[in-house]
């Protein structure tokens, strides 16, 4: 069963679930929400902070990115908290490679790069993709 909110996805991660799976399932939930209001409800509640600063920053970036890309009208206030930003750069490649790090630095979306997270240009890409929201 998919998490209903980003906060639930983080709870699952803290309880040992795979970060990649929990976040991917959350993105599916978000994309399948029938309205913009329902989508916003999935990111409105602040996820608990974890012992992993990368996850804390990543979920802030995810919520901000989804709110802006799907034109929800506003971004949850919790995404701007200092704990949602990294002090040091994090390049999300699985291996150390200067060329990959350079690529990620220049391809990262603003919502991620502003938090010192450097990832591909479509980090939340899913096969299903976003569904048109009823207005």
Regions found by a protein language model. Give the residues of each.
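Charge-dense, extended regions
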Residues: 67-135
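Charged, helix-prone or intrinsically disordered regulatory segments positioned adjacent to compact structured domains
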Residues: 1-74
